[in-house]
Regions:
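A domain-start/cap signature at the N-terminus of enzymes
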Residues: 18-51
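Short, surface-exposed "cap/lid" segments of acyl-processing enzymes
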Residues: 37, 45-81
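Cap/lid segment of the alpha/beta-hydrolase catalytic domain
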Residues: 88-114
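Alpha/beta-hydrolase active-site loop
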Residues: 105-131
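Gly/Ala-rich beta-loop-alpha elbow adjacent to hydrolase catalytic centers
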Residues: 141-146, 150
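Active-site nucleophile loop of the alpha/beta-hydrolase fold
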Residues: 165-174
Length: 264
């Protein structure tokens, strides 16, 4: 009887694990991370062994749907030597595809950059995409909250990313929350400024800041730039005429800055 009960329990566990896996994984629309589906939007002609793999990370959109701006970057940046993907952070949607996990309470109602819940799934999705597409160079671009995640990922996963591009970065999360005077201080969130000593010295980093950005104030990017310079990281700081809304009001300006950083 005990043996039979054990077999039934084992069967139930196996069934649960199988059901929890992301059966939609195709490395085009979804990738599986620890049984969860992480949603993607990317180039139509995805081929392995292209020279570059470029990943784009969005900010903290309130409706948990990243909209069409960042997905539109894909066609502007891709070429025959590049695979380009937008990754929807846990709990967010891209083109009606939703990533599992995240915080259902929404932006400003809880920490947005908790490592295990919000950042690790993205990093592991990037790792799987890198293993699958086998690029010579992996480039990660993040805007606003996506830039914060980018800074944490390069600090936590040394050697994973070859070139990081951070735009409108709240690179010191505790100080940024104080500056914004919104919600809590997000004490459980990871912050890029705490992780600079762990960053791979061979990485290239580009930091893009809007001169009039009153959301993620330029000072947070400038301070992060100084920290990277002290660690002898190859880092470039580029200031442009614009603010935090330039991403959706003048997207071509951001696209051109990304292209310039990639080609430099």
């Amino acid at each position: 009887m005990k043996k039979l009960l054990g077999i039934l329990v084992l069967g139930l566990l196996l069934s649960t694990n199988a059901h929890s896996a992301c059966e939609k994984e195709d490395f085009i629309k979804y990738v599986e991370v620890k049984g969860n589906c992480i949603a993607l939007f990317g180039t139509k002609k995805n081929e392995i062994n292209k020279k570059q793999l470029i990943i784009l990370l969005h900010g903290d959109h309130r409706k948990r749907d990243i909209g069409g701006i960042l997905p539109a970057f894909v066609n502007k940046i891709e070429n025959k030597d590049r695979n380009v993907f937008v990754i929807a952070r846990p709990g967010w949607k891209v083109k009606k595809r939703k990533s599992d996990g995240g915080d259902s309470r929404g932006v400003d109602r809880g920490d947005n950059y908790i490592f295990i819940r919000d950042i690790e799934p993205v990093a592991l999705a990037i790792k799987k995409l890198k293993e699958h597409y086998n690029p010579e160079e992996l480039i990660l671009f993040g805007y606003s909250g996506g830039a914060a995640l980018t800074g944490v990922i390069i600090g936590k996963y040394s050697g994973l990313i070859d070139h990081a591009i951070l735009a409108g970065c709240p690179c010191n999360v505790p100080e940024w929350r104080k500056y914004r005077k919104k919600g809590s201080g997000w004490p459980r969130s990871s912050s890029p400024h705490n992780l600079v000593s762990n960053i791979d010295k061979d990485i290239k980093v580009d930091i893009l800041i809007g001169k009039n950005d009153k959301n993620t104030h330029p000072k947070f990017s400038e301070q992060y730039y100084d920290l990277l310079k002290k660690e002898n990281i190859d880092v470039t700081l580029t200031s442009f005429n614009g603010d935090h809304s330039t991403m959706w009001k003048e997207p071509i300006k951001i696209i051109n800055l990304i292209k310039k950083a990639i080609d430099s």
